[in-house]
Amino acid sequence: MKKLLGVLALVLSVSSLAMADQDTVKEIHFSSEFRQSYTDKKTNTGNGLGIAGFKGQNKEKTRWRNVLGGDLNLVDEGNLGLRFEFQNDQDRVKNDFDYQNKKLVTNGVYDKSQTWENDIALYKDVKLGSWTAKWDLGWKYKSTNGNGRYAGHRGTSNEIYVGPGFGIDFFGHHFDGKAQFVYFDQSGEKDGDNAWSGSDFINGKTSGVGGNFDLATNGKVFDNRAGNLNYYVTLNNHLRDAKGKLVETGKDAKSTVYLDYVTGATYKTPELAGFYGLINTENEWEKQTARHGFKNNFSVWTGLGYKTGIDLSVGTLTLNPEVKYRVVNKETVKGVYDDGRYSSTDKYTREYNELRAGLNVGLEVK
């Protein structure tokens, strides 16, 4: 938390300096959220399926996530835009369970870690003939360290990306897309969307080049006195070609495309004095083309929130506390996504119910 407050102070200081030189802040946002997941870990019967209740022995992972982000207009630097987001996760994993023999291995916390991520990008509209596109030049970073008696560096990944955004009509729908050239490196447990983590390579790390080709669309099904229903689709395709030989085979790693396809819909009730309810259903399918297996996650969330806006001299401050519960979760895994809980099969379904409670704060500058 101290590091996050330090980042916040730094960003606000830089923003103040930027504004003094006629650069401007478009928006800034902060969120803090507590997450607790549960699964069935009852001795003799636990199978990682079904709603097993909010019992201590069924706890899986406790996460505290804090996010700080914003958007600046750098007037003195040729009207470049600067988009940034910093994320910190504090994780505790609890109750190590042997699903094969249906018994608890460790009662209570058996791992603690902290992960820092950032995504910082300069962007600008570039005109090529009659075509105008927003180009990004950005850097993504992710690093994890163990905490307390689990201390130790667990891995780092970096991604430098550059490329334009564009629009395309596909199956009768308009998609917003991105095409980016990528340089990446990774070490330890981090994979950077590669099919293998850094520790899978002989030197414990690797680097390479690739590309991102992402498509996204969304829209309204209805918006009336009964509330509103929105849908969304994202189709992410990330090519990674890493240099180096794998520990397992002694051969060069194959190039791979990470496929991440998400479809979902969210219904929100009409607001009553700022309060609203919501239901979200979503399906996410993931695969690495260079490896055997896939992961498919279907979930249904319910939630209750409150949203209000406060007019200030500099803009509008939005406060949005929200509580959500994942009542349905079916995560089917196969092959490389298998966590080894069963020796007899590499394909099975697991379930994690999850409770989330958090606060979102945003400032839209006039």
Region spans (language model):
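Gram-negative bacterial Sec-dependent N-terminal signal peptides
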Residues: 1-22
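Detector for outer-membrane/organellar transmembrane beta-barrel domains
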Residues: 171-291, 300
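Transmembrane beta-barrel strands of outer-membrane/channel proteins
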Residues: 30-38, 82-90, 135-143, 177-185, ...
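Short glycine/proline- and aromatic-enriched beta-strand/turn motifs that initiate or cap beta-hairpins
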Residues: 20-73, 81-97, 356
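Residues that define the transmembrane beta-barrel architecture of outer-membrane proteins
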Residues: 58-66, 112-120, 154-162, 203-213, ...
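Outer-membrane beta-barrel "beta-signal"
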Residues: 325-327, 349-366
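Outer-membrane beta-barrel translocator domains and adjoining extracellular loop/strand segments
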Residues: 41-58, 92-113, 144-157, 186-206, ...
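Short loop/turn motifs that connect adjacent beta-strands in outer-membrane beta-barrel proteins
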Residues: 20-28, 73-82, 123-135, 166-178, ...
